[in-house]
């Protein structure tokens, strides 16, 4: 976020999008994965086990731990370690073993930038064996709410090659505060309707709104005098439209295997005039005349009179994606016709050479 706590993004859903979007199939909830709230229904076991120290030689990853202890990831407590960018201070975050950390949420909570930790011997941390019990050192320790109230968990013992089983968060961890640091997952619980109906899709951000509030005006000590003669901080908003992203999004939504199919409203030209065999005098003369006539009538035309094969010309026209193609060729001249073909292949008509300009105008008018 640029500032403030509220923003809205306008997304086009597409498999090639750069952002991941959480979507509820049961209600109208939509959220960027960076901001989507992760709801967890924690289920505490009725019978609480004792905390037991277990020797786990050469076991480092959460997958290896669960396989060795014959337990599921969701019944484990894993540690994810970061460092503050400014001074490499360690942040140790505990989260349920089957979940991933949402680093944007974590950064927003901490209020400073972080990076994945490089754990050294001097840190006092033992990579692969870090746990919340008897964790000692100058660390910032955080707990994801997926662990709140949970029991009978496995976790690191802060001793090399040892883990605990039977961890009870209420019994064994005093004063823990729980916050939402987890990424929402496919099939997760919707924060709005409460149903396990979250799907994750990709999307392109084409616009955004940031409610900046007084974040920047306060930092710059910018004020104005209100009607009562008192100094007030202006409230700011930021409204962005990605012009380049919009063009890319339109191409993504309107294309085929041969290139873009520009909608008439945003097309760079309305008509692509193709003079096939422009070395033919009659083709060249008529195409030049039609081009000038269309321009005089306010039609935006791209004119291709290159001395290339028809296949090359049409292939290039597909790549450009102009909504309508007008074809002048020796064969058409002999038949006294002009071809009008739509880029999306929904229209293909022959019109008289004498009325071609008027017919093209009618076609454009009908397409608007």
Where are these regions (language model features)?
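NTP/phosphate- and nucleic-acid-binding module
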Residues: 1-368
